[in-house]
Amino acid sequence: MASPIASAALRARVKRPSMLKKLCNPEDMLQHFPNGAYIGWSGFTGVGYPKKVPTMLADHVEKNGLQGQLKYSLFVGASAGAETENRWAALDMIARRAPHQVGKNIAKGINEGRINFFDKHLSMFPVDLVYGYYTKDRQNKNLDVVCVEATEIKEDGSIVLGASVGATPELIQMADKVIIEVNTAIPSFDGLHDITFSDLPPNRKPYLIQQCRDRIGTTSVPVDPEKVVGIIECTTPDQTLPNSPADETATAIAGHLIEFFEHEVAHGRLPKNLLPLQSGIGNIANAVIGGLETSNFKNLNVWTEVIQDTFLDLFDSGKLDFATATSIRFSPTGFERFYKNWDNYYDKLLLRSQSVSNAPEIIRRLGVIGMNTPVEVDIYAHANSTNVMGSRMLNGLGGSADFLRNSKYSIMHTPSTRPSKTDAHGVSCIVPMCTHVDQTEHDLDVIVTENGLADVRGLSPRERARVIIDKCAHDVYKPILKAYFEKAEFECLRKGMGHEPHLLFNSFDMHKALVEEGSMAKVKF
């Protein structure tokens, strides 16, 4: 295949002329991906990920019938694009994956035992990578090759990332070889990043951040030019999907939270402009941010993982002063709006590595208000964020525990029920005992559903159970949960073991009823 010729757009983005000598076709990189290689990709929540090389490798496997014969250990800061990692999973190209993923095929591979998946707190993953934890059992202690999407290569050879940072600095730090995809379909993000690396103990330093807009790093990622084995032009934008619109349930949850914030301000526990907000992904998170737009709060700040379209509305309303994250995951129309109004948003946003955006040290110092959606919450305020029925992996822990363990306000918001195959309210999200625990009773302050808000700060386990059942459970499940709790309380207090009453032989009867009868509501204690 003939060597590619640099386009005018690529020449404008690559400011170090010697780098253009490494311009190549994706197919030229095939030699760097032997079976069993440990590889890394840039990207976080489906933006800023490499596209050309992963697609080339998938095409190669599909064309030559090599499914299951070219398999890799894949490390990405969080999830990459569905058309890359999800396709790899469908072609049986992933042997091992960490620390977070999104996609039906990759989840299927994990739950069928074909992919060894290890989820980890997102603040810890890049650090553990640099510690050598993920390469400790192989002769080569580094990653074999890392593919990175950039929007510019500067004169010194450092790279300007795109819509996410994630674990890219640490992946490059641990790479033997680096392939850079320069995306000319989107603007250069020069100046929008604050790049830091993870040092090893005993030489680690504190993150000297006291406000959301503080900078402690550089605007680009240093790369050893000797590591770079290929430069490829990419003309494909991130393939994101429209955001989920808020429904009545999400809007009701948002209303309860706004009322709670107003209550905390009135009692002097929050300033009038609140404290930095962290919000997860999904329609409830969107509804909360939308609720803030129509509230009386102003001069807000955001310290979070991912910024979505609703934050643009909050900026445009004049109520959001500054937002920092490790990723901006807009919908296609959101990105169009962002690029069109670049000058309005440019100095109000900052993207950091996930080891900083999710750093417990900073979250605790800033007093962040952390909000996330779980799979289920139990009556004592333990939460399950990952494993349905205790066994089926969804996406991974992500950064939920980074924030919920360390925020000033640790909030779990969830619908009170979800539908099963046969019952619109067949799954209660409030259960007697979580089938898997990611956040403990010691971490959470507030549980909120569309029915109400349970403030469990300072409450004993039995007090928590009563308020969670009363405020949060769906009407269908309130009598069921009360019956379980009252029976457990009676039996355990009678035996002198009633601090946190449980009947272990009944704790999962609701889950059993779901499996056997199609609805938790059909439980019989």
Curated annotation (Swiss-Prot):
Amino acids binding CoA: G280, I281, G282, N283, I284, N395, G399
Gene Ontology CC, one term: mitochondrion
Name this protein carries in UniProt: Acetyl-CoA hydrolase
Compartment annotation: Cytoplasm
Catalytic reactions of this protein: acetyl-CoA + H2O = acetate + CoA + H(+)
Similarity comment: family membership: Belongs to the acetyl-CoA hydrolase/transferase family.
Gene3D superfamilies listed in its UniProt record: 4-hydroxybutyrate coenzyme like domains (3.30.750.70), Acetyl-CoA hydrolase/transferase C-terminal domain (3.40.1080.20), Glutaconate Coenzyme A-transferase (3.40.1080.10)
